[in-house]
Amino acid sequence: MKIFTLYTMIQQYFFDNGGVYSIKNFYSAVPKEKMNIILVSLDCELQKLALKLSKKTSGTHTTH
């Protein structure tokens, strides 16, 4: 499964269930072994993305 699809699914789950506060529900809905794999691969992809973005912006940081 592509990590972006996974991320979108997780994000959609949060929106459907009242935002970030429902993260506990998400954890309980997904088996622990699977969740670890998801988190590790998500973390890896986010780091790659952050690296790409930092190269593009070259020092100019904006926060949401």
UniProtKB/Swiss-Prot annotation:
Superkingdom in the source lineage: Eukaryota
Full protein name: Uncharacterized protein YBR182C-A
Organism of this sequence: Saccharomyces cerevisiae (strain ATCC 204508 / S288c) (Baker's yeast)
Lineage per the UniProt record: Eukaryota, Fungi, Dikarya, Ascomycota, Saccharomycotina
